Structures are given as structure tokens and as C-alpha cells.
């Protein structure tokens, strides 16, 4: 949810720091204030000699939407606009599905996505003879001839180059160092880009319907069931083997349609909405050696129909419609 990290190093330990806001950063302990001076000067202090600020084109609006089957009429669309003063700022990015089910979640995620989109639009790059600038810390630049560049920055990337010329002949300095860096103005919200996407499934999977011991059907008011997947090494083939999973039917309307709840022990085919492993849905059933077709095959292959069977305790009662 917009959380990012960096390391703080000390002689005794290395600390992983997590934050989601610019005020979670500290000033560089040894260089909270740094001056700019022209390259080539020999000064008895560390300084920055090169810095260039830039503005980039960024989309100015982020729109997200999703669908919740428990509240199908809910309006979950969320829009956040934060355009920069550049060209193409009126463009928008539309994301579906947003992977949320409440308006509050949608507003938060849309804001974070917009901040991540806007964040790289204002950056500065530079270099200097300074060793104490560290990624994840802030400092304030001073003495630059362009007043707007003199401000507080967050160091989002640093690279330290060291060169030892002690074994070389000549009059060059025996030891030189330069730090290059990328800066983000602290007056702007810093939000890193998403570099990893949510894992997606590939194709449907086979599973066995499960439920409590002694039951033949285990469902809820939505007609959902629970299953155990073949790859699940730790499930116990019971009512806790999975989340509730929706079932697709040939016909479904408001108070009408076709319904047959998959029974415990039946093999079903489970696919995933939008490839999301958190949104399984049963899209079909299939026979296997334990649950064979209702009449002999291939001898009766020409017959088609529907065949029902009574639950436990109801005897061997069957009803069918054959074509």
C-alpha cells in the first residue's frame, strides 16, 4: 500500500526501515546542509558541483473500478486527479480491476496510484565531492545561483565512486571521490513505482468439493462451496480446505434459473476471475473413477439427459429426464 524501504547502517547493526510518507526520513547525520560550488575549486570542505532539475510528462488522472458480487449495484469507481503543469497532463490512466471491494479502499488505492504516477515528474540529478550523502536521507542544498534549486531533497539513489592513485606516478591527487545522486523534492509526495504485479493463474485447475464429516452438501446462501486442490499438501478435506467459492450455472436470474450445488466428493474445474488467485470460481464439473456417469458408456453414448440422486437417508431414489 505504498510502503517502501531502505537500510540504515552502523558499526553494530544494519536496520531495515519501512515508511509510506516523506516525514519518515531523517536528515543526513553528517551533512544536513550542503553547499553548491563550481567544479574545480579546491575547498576545505565537501560540496556539490553539479545539479540539474527536470520535469517529466506524467498522466494527470488515475481512475480505478471494480465489482463486488455481494453488492452488485455499488458504485466503486474512484478518481484522483493531480496534474502537473506540463503537456498531456489531462490524460488519464484507467485500471480495471482495482482489486478492492469498498469505496474507502478504492479511494486509498487510487490516491496511492496517482501519487506513484506523479512522483517521478519532478527530479534532480547531480554529483559532488561528498561522501556523507546516503540513500533514504534528506539534505538541504544551499548557495546555488538558481534560487529555486536551493531546497530540501530526499536522496532516492546514490552511487559513490572512489579512486586511489597512490601507486601511480605523476602529480594527480592520490585519492579522489565523487558521489552521483538522484533527488526528489521533499515538498512533493514521494511514492515509488510498482515494480511487481500480483501473481496470475494460468488456466483452470481441478479440485474436489469438501465439507464437514457426515455432510453431503455444504454451501452458503450464495450457493458457494469449498474445495481441496490437488496441490494442497496441508488441507484436511473438510470445511476449512478453502475459502467459499462461487459456482457458475447455465442460467441465473433474480429468483429463477438453474441450480445444482456441487456435492462433497465431486470433482470440479476451478478457474479464476481476471486470473486473480483470490477470486476462484467453479466453471464446470467432470466425472472420474469415483463419480462415474449415470448410465453405461460407451454403450448408451447416444442418450443425453439430466439425472438426479437423493441425499443420504433418502434411499436410492433417482429422477431423470432423458433425451
Task: Locate the predicted segments by residue.
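Amphipathic alpha-helical and helix-coil boundary elements used as assembly
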Residues: 1-323
